[in-house]
């Protein structure tokens, strides 16, 4: 039976044998689809126990977990913490900007299966950061790094990931 162990920014990854905390791990740890019914999800394989509905506060909000850049409805409350939070100071005026929690679907990053979570940023993340965060493309923005890898950069499009040899952001 698949099990989860903590790795890569604290998120669970799939392994075999052992336990997850004090409970046996469930095969749903390795689920790859995003919008699964909450009845088959287990708290054992979730990063936080209250994140059990794949960023969908209610059953009628079914598009929140789809790979779209601008779908924000329901995401602020679906990932465990509602509202926005302060994000330091901007410029010399001392104005405080506001970070918003954007939903990110389930995807593979650095060869690791990650459950759905939220990207916290001041502006809407690009699809590259939000959905196509892959080792060969962009760094995972939810780990505090939003710049692209030097090898290639995904274009911020919701249709298909397009990689180019040059990076849109050469430095972090």
Curated annotation (Swiss-Prot):
The source of this keratin is lincoln wool. Keywords: Acetylation, Keratin, Repeat. Sequence repeats lie at residues 27-36, 37-46, 47-56, 57-66, 67-76. One of its GO terms (cellular component) is keratin filament. Changing residue 23 to N: In minor component. It comes from the Eukaryota. This is Keratin, high-sulfur matrix protein, B2A. The keyword Repeat applies. The modification N-acetylalanine is found at residue 2. Pfam families: Keratin_B2 (PF01500). The keyword Acetylation applies. The keratin products of mammalian epidermal derivatives such as wool and hair consist of microfibrils embedded in a rigid matrix of other proteins. The matrix proteins include the high-sulfur and high-tyrosine keratins, having molecular weights of 6-20 kDa, whereas the microfibrils contain the larger, low-sulfur keratins (40-56 kDa). It comes from Ovis aries.
């Amino acid at each position: 039976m698949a099990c989860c162990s903590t790795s890569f920014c604290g998120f669970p990854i799939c392994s075999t044998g052992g336990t997850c905390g004090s409970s046996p791990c469930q095969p749903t740890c390795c689920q790859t689809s995003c919008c699964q019914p909450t009845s088959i999800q287990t708290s054992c394989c979730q990063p936080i126990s209250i994140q059990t509905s794949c960023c969908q506060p209610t059953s009628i909000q079914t598009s929140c977990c789809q790979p779209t850049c601008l779908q924000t409805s329901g995401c602020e409350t679906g990932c465990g913490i509602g509202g926005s939070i302060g994000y330091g100071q901007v410029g010399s005026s001392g104005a405080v900007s506001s970070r918003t929690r954007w939903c990110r679907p389930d995807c593979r990053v650095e060869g690791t299966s990650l459950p759905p979570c939220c990207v916290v940023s001041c502006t809407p993340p690009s699809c590259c950061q939000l959905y196509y965060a892959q080792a060969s493309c962009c760094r995972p923005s939810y780990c505090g790094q939003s710049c692209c890898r030097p090898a290639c950069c995904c274009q911020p499009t919701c249709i298909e990931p397009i990689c180019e040899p040059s990076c849109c952001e050469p430095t972090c």
